[in-house]
């Protein structure tokens, strides 16, 4: 049996799984699938959550990753940072585009984009 699920987030940003989903994780081999991994922060929360709920993480895969590994787990990705010229990920106070007051064109997330 293969289960595919996504976590919810509580008020402090922790990933949680409801009671009806927990049996899909507890004692199971888990493959974490991501679209994009930039800093690894969300991936770290995913690892913490899956281990908390008793899952056995067997792999991490993504379409793009700027991170090679997390928590001693290799990240397997189709594209890496070296494949995207001039790729950068910054904290807002370190962003060179922000410092140059360069405006952004849109906000993009899993539901689409909104032009600004």
Model-derived features: where do they sit?
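Short, glycine/charge-rich flexible loops or terminal/linker lids adjacent to PRPP-binding catalytic cores
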Residues: 1-31, 41, 92
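Short, flexible coil/linker segments at or flanking structured domains
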Residues: 13, 18, 45, 83-86
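PRPP-dependent phosphoribosyltransferase catalytic core
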Residues: 47-116
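Generic structural signal for helix capping and beta-alpha/helix-loop junctions
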Residues: 10-12, 35, 67
């Amino acid at each position: 049996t293969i289960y595919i699920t996504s976590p919810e987030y509580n008020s402090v940003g922790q990933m949680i799984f409801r009671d009806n989903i927990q049996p899909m994780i507890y004692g199971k081999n888990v493959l974490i699938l991501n679209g994009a991994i930039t800093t690894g922060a969300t991936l770290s929360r995913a690892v913490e959550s899956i281990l908390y709920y008793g899952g056995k993480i067997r792999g991490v895969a993504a379409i793009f990753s700027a991170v090679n590994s997390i928590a001693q787990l290799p990240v397997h990705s189709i594209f890496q940072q070296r494949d995207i010229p001039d790729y950068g990920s910054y904290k807002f106070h370190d962003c060179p585009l922000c410092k140059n007051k360069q405006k952004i064109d849109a906000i993009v997330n899993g539901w689409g984009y909104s032009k600004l």
